[in-house]
Amino acid sequence: GAIETRDNGKLPSQITPSLREGAWLLDSWYYYAGMCDKFEGKLIPAELPDMHNYMKWEPFGVVAQILPWNSPIGTLIWKLAPCLAAGNTVVLKPSEQASCSILELMDILLDADIPPGVLNVVTGYGHTTGEPLIDHPDVRMVSFTGGTNGGKAAAKIASQQVKPIVMELGGKSPQIVLPDADIDLAVNGVASGIFPAGGQSCISGSRLLIHYSIIDKFTEQLVKVCKRATVGDPLQESTTIGPIANRVHYERILDNIDKAQKEGHN
């Protein structure tokens, strides 16, 4: 967890719980490990007596997996297990902004006697490493997690060879609060939905839709919760919001704040 924290600024408390024994991420590996011998074919009645009609499952072969910077370990775990269980080999491409935790985890997995060539990692930028990986003729399937623009580019490249691609892209998830809501509970829920990982997640509740009849009361209490937040070093226990992962995002946030203030918001 500490390695990923140093990569992307995410608090250890938001990383390590899902990696402990019994947590859902590791449980998913047990689940998919149990599926390895469950892929079965099917015999289908044929129309003609001399016809043999059946269905069987076959691995795609080489699968390219593109990982995001905001949750690299978690994304790797839920991508990798089903892919290997189905008999595929994998080439991982972590984000250039958060590669260290993935490289460390790869060392651990390779020590577990995974056969040579089954699990591979390449690092680099999207345009110099990710795009050629997706375009490589030996890659038969692509799994991409990242921003919407990156997903569009990946889908365009994969489509040139009619490669199947699975994508999990960025979102703008609204949090809706209606008049009959428990305001205290709703305020805490809204704060918990946006502040983890500094709001840098595809599941962050980055839009608020509040009924006009409770907007003043809700806003007042939400501001109080925000003022209790501690922004700082993510490795300090007192910190509740770590740093933004890169300067581009940091400056975009400041620009949005500046625009809001110029429009009369405070």
Feature map (PLM): residue ranges:
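ALDH superfamily catalytic-core signature
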Residues: 135, 141, 149-266
